[in-house]
């Protein structure tokens, strides 16, 4: 079952959205020192990547990369302690931090290692980008995202999370908002981290069910369920089907134009059947009919044709309705990210330079309540700290008092840290339990 997180994550502080606190990319470099010094969760970040020091050199051999101002990219960084990493972050104030694999030797010595570095472990990661849904969303495109198209990410997280837990037995999964238009999934179980290249390829291929057929107007998503649909496809269908009408027919009105009707027709993977369906729709639908009417007409025709034992609709198209629903709503994975051992992925709690938003963790059990349009920006966070301190004067009165409230608790970033720390507690409990068995 999806991971449960305390109710605190849903108790977002009041957010300031006035133009006065709008994010300006030109002053990001001026704000990052304050963010890294006062808000970035250095200790939880270290606790995650060190995994309780359960394995030799698991932290010190981890490759970290920084992207600095003016696109200066520094790879092969590594650190022996949490203090070293924190000092370097606060000194360089990177615009982005990327996390790579744990190597067989310290990455900083890569030039002197015969044969180069060899990765020995790495979290199993998934990257889902909203731009891969541009062909099936009409509300936004490119870097744009709104609450309507965020529902594609809601379904992606739900489908993928339950598959990873039920089909592979993974437990320690953290979901991260990418800061702009996508989501990242980190699977941190020991077995996942130690998968070899073939194992990662197998997992990626198992979960990547969408294929594409080329037509004059572009690529058409396809999902073949076969004569005996796999249980994972049946489970995914149970998740996406209840939201199909809301997302595809209402929010996106995907079939509400001639181009949209063509998208639907192109998903019928039989030339003769497609031609028959097109003729039927031309006779029974007006141009520009709402998607709901188009879909109802399609369902009516498909059901009537299934009664013919000689028709493709009763054989290879018998699951066409479910295949279209999955083809439009199933997670669209960048499988090269998952298959690759050396891929570096953006770290949680980075600031996206284009939007200024924090790459915050979220709970999959509350993903439908997650609003990407109100994720706090660095500008907003610094204002929230100042507003809190001006009100309480606690920061000025007790700068060295260890009992004073932590800065992230003064801001709307707090709920993301709560999600992350709850994930860490479960991960660390599991590691302690495993160590007691030896």
Swiss-Prot record:
- How is this protein's activity kept under control? The presence of the regulatory subunit Prim2 accelerates the kinetics of initiation and primer extension.
Q: Which tissues does the record link to its expression? A: Expressed in embryos (at protein level).
What InterPro entries does the record tag this protein with? DNA_primase_S, DNA_primase_ssu_euk/arc
What's its top-level EC category? transferase
Q: Where is this motif: Zinc knuckle motif?
A: 139-149
Q: Which GO terms describe its biological process?
A: DNA replication initiation; DNA replication, synthesis of primer; DNA-templated DNA replication
So where's the catalytic machinery, residue-wise?
63, 127, 129
**Enzyme Commission number:** 2.7.7.-
Alphabetical list of Pfam families matching this protein: DNA_primase_S
Keyword terms, alphabetized: DNA replication, DNA-directed RNA polymerase, Metal-binding, Nucleotidyltransferase, Primosome, Transcription, Transferase, Zinc
Identify the CDD domains for this entry: AE_Prim_S
MF terms in GO: DNA-directed RNA polymerase activity; metal ion binding
Q: Has UniProt tagged this entry with the keyword Zinc-finger? A: no
Cite the record's note on assembly: Heterodimer of a catalytic subunit Prim1 and a regulatory subunit Prim2, also known as the DNA primase complex. Component of the alpha DNA polymerase complex (also known as the alpha DNA polymerase-primase complex) consisting of four subunits: the catalytic subunit PolA1, the regulatory subunit PolA2, and the primase complex subunits Prim1 and Prim2 respectively. PolA1 associates with the DNA primase complex before association with PolA2.
Function, in words: Catalytic subunit of the DNA primase complex and component of the DNA polymerase alpha complex (also known as the alpha DNA polymerase-primase complex) which play an essential role in the initiation of DNA synthesis. During the S phase of the cell cycle, the DNA polymerase alpha complex (composed of a catalytic subunit PolA1, an accessory subunit PolA2 and two primase subunits, the catalytic subunit Prim1 and the regulatory subunit Prim2) is recruited to DNA at the replicative forks.
The record's comment on protein family reads: Belongs to the eukaryotic-type primase small subunit family.
Question: What protein name does the entry list?
Answer: DNA primase small subunit
From which source organism is this entry?
Drosophila melanogaster
Q: Recall the taxonomic lineage recorded for the source organism.
A: Eukaryota, Metazoa, Ecdysozoa, Arthropoda, Hexapoda
Q: Give the gene symbol.
A: Prim1
């Amino acid at each position: 079952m999806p991971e449960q997180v305390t109710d605190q994550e849903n108790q977002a502080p009041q957010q300031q959205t006035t133009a006065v606190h709008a994010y300006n990319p030109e002053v990001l470099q001026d704000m990052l020192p304050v963010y890294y010094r006062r808000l970035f969760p250095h200790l939880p970040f270290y606790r995650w990547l060190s995994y309780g020091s359960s394995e030799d050199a698991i932290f010190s051999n981890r490759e970290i990369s920084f992207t600095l101002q003016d696109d200066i990219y520094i790879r092969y960084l590594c650190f022996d302690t949490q203090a070293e990493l924190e000092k370097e972050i606060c000194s360089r104030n990177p615009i982005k931090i990327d996390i790579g694999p744990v190597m067989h030797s310290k990455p900083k010595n890569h030039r002197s290692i015969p044969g180069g570095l060899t990765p020995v472990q790495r979290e199993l990661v998934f990257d889902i980008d909203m731009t891969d849904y541009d062909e099936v969303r009409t509300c936004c495109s490119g870097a744009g995202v709104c609450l309507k198209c965020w529902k594609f990410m809601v379904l992606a997280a739900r489908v993928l999370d339950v598959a990873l837990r039920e089909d592979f037995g993974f437990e320690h999964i953290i979901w991260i908002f990418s800061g702009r238009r996508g989501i990242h999934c980190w699977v941190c179980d020991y077995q996942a981290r130690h998968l070899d290249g073939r194992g990662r390829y197998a997992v990626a291929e198992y979960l990547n069910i969408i294929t594409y057929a080329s037509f004059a107007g572009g690529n058409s998503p396809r999902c073949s369920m076969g004569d005996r649909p796999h249980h994972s496809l049946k489970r995914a269908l149970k998740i996406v089907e209840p939201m199909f009408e809301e997302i595809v027919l209402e929010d996106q009105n995907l079939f509400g134009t001639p181009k949209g009707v063509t998208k639907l027709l192109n998903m019928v993977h039989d030339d003769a059947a497609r031609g028959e369906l097109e003729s039927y729709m031309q006779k029974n639908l007006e141009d520009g009919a709402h998607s709901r009417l188009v879909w109802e007409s399609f369902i009516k025709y498909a059901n009537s044709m299934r009664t013919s034992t000689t028709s493709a609709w009763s054989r290879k198209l018998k699951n066409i309705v479910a295949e279209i629903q999955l083809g439009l709503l199933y997670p669209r994975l960048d499988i090269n990210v998952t298959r690759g051992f050396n891929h570096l992925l953006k770290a949680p709690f980075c600031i996206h330079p284009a939007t200024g938003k924090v790459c915050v963790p979220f709970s999959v059990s509350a993903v439908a309540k997650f609003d990407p349009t109100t994720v706090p920006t660095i500008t907003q966070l610094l204002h929230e700290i100042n507003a809190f301190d001006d009100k309480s004067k606690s920061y000025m009165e007790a700068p060295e008092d260890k009992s004073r409230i932590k800065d992230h608790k003064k801001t709307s970033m707090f709920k993301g840290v709560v999600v992350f720390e709850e994930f860490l507690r479960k991960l660390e409990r599991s590691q302690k339990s495993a160590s007691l068995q030896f």
